[in-house]
């Protein structure tokens, strides 16, 4: 079974300024110019590979991926990553955030 790894995909929590700026979408739209909508919502493995190749080297690839993660996009290729991998990434992030919340609560208790 093939797995995919995405390095450095986390954008600092709370920093959503890039989502508010429509420029990233304009860059993505320009880079994807001429690609049909269905290109990024492929129906077979060949289409998935092709969509991922389009995302390689895109200057807003990480932002596109983070947008999909933040908005729970369950379909399509976003930032060169499949829905299955994004689901795993969200689960990992959620576990990490739960652990951080526990540590934070323990530190607050110790500080009292």
Predicted segments with their positions:
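Short, surface-exposed, polar/charged, turn-prone segments marking secondary-structure boundaries
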Residues: 59-62, 68-70, 86, 104-108
């Amino acid at each position: 079974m093939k797995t995919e790894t995405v390095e450095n995909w986390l954008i600092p929590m709370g920093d959503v300024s890039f989502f508010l700026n429509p420029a990233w979408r304009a860059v993505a739209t320009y880079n994807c110019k001429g690609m049909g909508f269905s290109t990024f919502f492929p129906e077979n493995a060949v289409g998935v590979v092709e969509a991922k190749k389009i995302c390689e080297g895109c200057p807003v690839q990480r932002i596109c991926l983070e947008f999909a993660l933040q908005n729970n996009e369950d379909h399509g290729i976003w930032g060169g990553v499949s829905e299955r991998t994004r689901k795993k990434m969200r689960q990992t992030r959620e576990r990490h955030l739960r652990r951080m919340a526990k540590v934070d609560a323990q530190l607050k208790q110790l500080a009292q």
